[in-house]
UniProtKB/Swiss-Prot annotation:
Monomer. Belongs to the aldo/keto reductase family. This is Aldo-keto reductase family 1 member C23. One of its GO terms (molecular function) is oxidoreductase activity. It is found in: Cytoplasm. The record marks 84 as: Lowers pKa of active site Tyr. Its main location: cytoplasm.
């Protein structure tokens, strides 16, 4: 089945494509690469493009989308584009200007989904990760329920079709869901999710509240300087590799297919054209229920993206069980 057709309904009536293209790349990757990679992704069949202000490449991704609309490959309504509100803009008066800046960079009139990237607020300003002289994060104190009300206003104004969150734990989701006067529920919670961190408790909770779980770092995580270098490489896992041989697929495809069959929307991040084309093949086969159980058994609650620089803040999400 092709990736354009497989969509999941959100609790506000809109639909999200089950497989998305992740646009994040480490700083050392030239920004121009985002243009080519996004074009390749759209050519390969990706229609769900996951962006963020934090990635500093929304202009480039926007150029790619614009060029694929201009050359007739897609129409705007074929594309599901996500952007994210960064931690420097969680004060309610900063939410709409942040979204408007992303729209300007993306050259779009609206995004399909706008999400709160991280529940910890840091000092507003141009610097993504403001630090004091000791190298500690400069936090801000923000009422996330007020931030959410500003997100709701963005949806009502037509700047985004849907609104959601990312990196929220159960307690933080409940805080939004139980907010007096809640107008729009979050449609999704985008979190790190892969066979080593399968998020089964959070997934069950989200399903019970009609919130879609979206998986980032679904293939483990690239060897970045801020990732613990001693952590095991997911795609080299012997069980995953044996299963890949059995299905005549790559370990990456097994990891992506695993999420699709659990009802998780999954992001595949690659700037390599061959792998981009390969990742859309996640729709071309099915894992047996026995093999799904085997993959469930790989869980070891291993989080690659700990974002420990935020750990001193009361809203740091990863201290709770889930």
């Amino acid at each position: 089945m092709d990736p354009k057709g497989w969509r999941v309904e959100l609790n506000d009536g809109h639909f999200i494509h089950a497989l998305g293209f992740g646009t994040y790349a480490p700083n050392e990757v030239p920004k121009s690469k985002a243009v080519e990679a996004t074009k390749s992704a759209i050519d390969a069949g990706f229609r769900h493009i996951d962006c963020a202000h934090l990635y500093d490449n929304e202009k480039e991704v926007g150029l790619a989308i614009r060029s694929k609309i201009q050359d007739g490959t897609v129409k705007r309504e074929d594309i599901f584009c996500t952007s994210k509100l960064w931690a420097t803009s969680l004060r309610l008066q900063l939410v709409r200007p942040a979204l408007e800046k992303s729209l300007k960079n993306l050259q779009l009139d609206y995004v399909d989904l706008y999400i709160i990237h991280f529940p910890v607020a840091v000092k507003p300003g141009e610097e993504h990760l403001p630090q004091d002289e000791q190298g500690r994060m400069i936090f801000d104190t923000v009422d996330l329920c007020a931030t959410w009300e500003a997100m709701e206003k963005c949806k009502d104004a037509g700047l985004t079709k849907s609104i959601g969150v990312s990196n929220f734990n159960r307690r933080q989701l409940e805080m939004i869901l139980n907010k007096p006067g809640l107008k729009h529920k979050p449609v999704c919670n985008q979190v790190e999710c892969h066979p080593y961190l399968n998020q089964s408790k959070l997934l069950d909770f989200c399903k019970s509240k009609d919130i879609v779980l979206v998986a980032y770092s679904a293939l483990g995580s690239q060897r970045e300087h801020w990732i613990d270098q001693s952590s095991p490489v997911l795609l080299e896992d012997p069980v995953l590799c044996a299963m890949a041989k059995k299905y005549k697929r790559t370990p990456a495809l097994i990891a992506l297919r695993y999420q699709l069959q659990r009802g998780v929307v999954v992001l595949a991040k690659s700037y390599n054209e061959k792998r981009i084309k390969e990742n859309v093949q996640a729709f071309g086969f099915q894992l047996t229920s026995e093999d799904m159980k085997v993959l469930d058994g790989l869980n070891r609650n291993l989080r690659y993206v700990t974002l420990e620089m935020f750990a001193g803040h009361p809203e740091y999400p990863f201290s709770d069980d889930y």
